[in-house]
Amino acid sequence: MKTDIEIAREAKLEKITKIAEKIDISEEYVEPYGKYIAKVDLKIWEKVKNNKDGKLILVTAMTPTPAGEGKTTTSIGLSMALNRLGKKSIVTLREPSLGPVFGIKGGAAGGGYSQVLPMENINLHFTGDIHAVSAAHNLISAVIDAHIKFGNELGIDPTRIYWKRTIDMNDRALRNIVVGLGGSANGQPREDGFIITAASEIMAILCLAKDLKDLKERLSNIVVAQSYDKKLIKVKDLKIEGALAVLLKDAIKPNLVQTIENTPAFVHGGPFANIAHGTNSIIATKLALKLSDYVVTEAGFAADLGAEKFLDFVSPTAGYDVNAVVVVATIKALKYHGGVKKDELDNENVEAMLKGMENLRVHVENLKKYNVPVIVALNVFGSDTQRELDEFSKNCEIPHALVYAFEKGGEGAVDLANLVLENIKESQYKPLITSEMSLEEKIETLAKEIYRAGNVIYTDKAKSKLKFLRKHGYDTLPVIVAKTQSSISDDPKKINAPSGYTFTIRDFELSAGAGFIVALAGDIMRMPGLSKIPNAVNIDIDEEGNIIGLS
């Protein structure tokens, strides 16, 4: 089979104005970035806000292998299939981060014959949204250090600066650094560090903001440091929320692109699901709901991460109703959770596959607690044997369909689309976590009901931070748990369906502007590192300007 980039290059793209017409976006609201990409002017909301909402389909997955299980490919395929069946459907996705593109996971524009295009642009610099987030984030850092150098009127304690710098790259060497070296002209020396842009609070804010006014308000409330007299320093104290909003004025507008079958797609925003809330912008999804019958959206990593955060935090924040959830599974991931080593996953092993189905069962059981219909999509790979596929179908008690979107595009997801249409209903969804719960109750509920832990413990550092949050009145905010994506638990080595273990909260981080608290479990880091042989070694460009190796 041809590579993703070869398939993408052969696709016949339609002008973005034509794609916009298909979902009733008139030309006055289309801001083209070349022939095939456009921003959509936020003024369109006044025109469509009274339209009836379409139905929202959330795509998630079982606990993945390191390479991922094809959620994006399945999401795109499902939306294309719904369009093939005469339904008006839009897929809404996150923007790829350059870190994973050049790291182990590769791009995030789908794969095979189920892609959003133009994939080279989407996977690389796209419309500059992520760079705008980086610029806004680093402006805060620059202003903090300049403020300290020129008199420090706010009394910022350099040892209590919470705001690290950012870059959209996997670079472990930048996790902990010292800035301000080289003499007083370069500022005051202090410890600092970098996080990846997808983990920036500004990325979360961009994806949660409802409009420019809300964006500016959220930016102003970011807590960046503490003063010598223990007061919290916010962006509004630095008087730069206006400048930050200016840097983000175009980034807040949704990006319209197309699938390989010329159906519409919004690709906007890119917070990670293991260290943030893990789904595309509220603005893009709300707009898509007003413009189509069915919106297919994806939440990062497995159902214990992206889907939980979508159902407990994003949907209540945005006011979404969720009408169905699709859980992507693969024979490879099932075998992996059944104990098969990574280099043996292509070998037939029905026994291990059946054992690994416990992981899928737990995720489905968890999702049903939200009172939503759950459908399983088995993303079929060429290495899957007929016996494995037959045994999966025989033993999967949940409505399920085999998906061949990678090989066949929308045609390969028609069975899934029909199954979704059969099971979808008017939303009766309700979150598991409520605002009335205390912070500890929220964490304990997630730990026991979703992560299947027996109990929760807090390190001394976490207990101290909890007191800090209470003192400043932030303990009532929603909680986002940052943990490994490789296990339902807080330990990446605990595969399949661990239960009854101790779940440890080691620290808390405040995202006051975004409007949530991050509870850190395990050794999760906000700045990834590259692997020994990163995807970067496979990427090249020929003399004619054709990119090679991007996927």
Curated annotation (Swiss-Prot):
<protein>
    <recommendedName>
        <fullName>Formate--tetrahydrofolate ligase</fullName>
        <ecNumber>6.3.4.3</ecNumber>
    </recommendedName>
</protein>
<dbReference type="Pfam" id="PF01268">
    <property type="entry name" value="FTHFS"/>
</dbReference>
<keyword id="KW-0436">Ligase</keyword>
<comment type="similarity">
    <text>Belongs to the formate--tetrahydrofolate ligase family.</text>
</comment>
<dbReference type="InterPro" id="IPR020628">
    <property type="entry name" value="Formate_THF_ligase_CS"/>
</dbReference>
<dbReference type="GO" id="GO:0004329">
    <property type="term" value="F:formate-tetrahydrofolate ligase activity"/>
</dbReference>
<keyword id="KW-0547">Nucleotide-binding</keyword>
<dbReference type="GO" id="GO:0005524">
    <property type="term" value="F:ATP binding"/>
</dbReference>
<dbReference type="GO" id="GO:0035999">
    <property type="term" value="P:tetrahydrofolate interconversion"/>
</dbReference>
<keyword id="KW-0067">ATP-binding</keyword>
<dbReference type="InterPro" id="IPR000559">
    <property type="entry name" value="Formate_THF_ligase"/>
</dbReference>
<comment type="pathway">
    <text>One-carbon metabolism; tetrahydrofolate interconversion.</text>
</comment>
<feature type="binding site">
    <location>
        <begin position="65"/>
        <end position="72"/>
    </location>
    <ligand>
        <name>ATP</name>
    </ligand>
</feature>
<keyword id="KW-0554">One-carbon metabolism</keyword>
<dbReference type="InterPro" id="IPR027417">
    <property type="entry name" value="P-loop_NTPase"/>
</dbReference>
